[in-house]
Amino acid sequence: MILLKKAIAIKNDSLERFQTFFEKGRIMILHAPCGFGKTTLVNEVLCDRCEKILKISADRISDGIRDPDKWEVLVVDDLQTIHSEEEEQLLCALVRDNPNKRFVLLTRGAIPGWVMPFRLTGLMFELSAGDMFFDRETAKNFFDKSAVRLADGELDGIMRDSWGYPLALTLIAEHMKKGEPYGSSLLGEGTHEIYMY
């Protein structure tokens, strides 16, 4: 769920939610601010499950309509940029008219009201920022995959200070991989980098 060269860690809960989506759903929506690993999570989960994936930005939603036979899963990023009712209706029609297709929607904002009818039918599943915060086990797995050796108790401090925010953990791992010890100066530098992200 995090971009650090090949270091990716995914919470088991997120994997289970995607499994349920593939078994019972048609729409999966991930809504969280930047830095929660929405795109990384979707790329990682879908690459193992599907061959025909079309990824588009919301401002190119009409591209998904051109040839639905060429994709099994349509990934629409930046859903928060859809501002016209015409684009909203276009996406809703695409979902309704293609019952054998899956749709993965990513947004930095709240779930738009115009997709709520799909939620009420039970066809839509979601992952929020709260779902994407790393727990201790996922964070440890991430640091291990990042080849960052943590001293006793360091993970506790990192989790306390970062709250498990994926971007913060990525920045901490990048600095620690360079040999910087975890502490207030690294935390301050990381906070500045997050602010500038």
Predicted features and spans:
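N-terminal pre-P-loop "Q-motif" helix
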Residues: 4-18
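The catalytic "switch" region of P-loop NTPases
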Residues: 100, 112-149
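Conserved P-loop NTPase "ATPase switch" module shared by AAA+ and STAND
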Residues: 67-87, 106
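Sensor-1/coupling segment of RecA-like P-loop NTPase cores
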Residues: 81-83, 93-121
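Conserved catalytic segments around the Walker B and adjacent sensor/switch elements
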Residues: 47-62
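Amphipathic alpha-helical "lid/sensor" segments that cap RecA-like P-loop NTPase cores
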Residues: 35, 42, 126, 144-197
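Walker A/P-loop nucleotide-binding motif
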Residues: 25-42
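Phosphate-binding P-loop
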Residues: 19-25
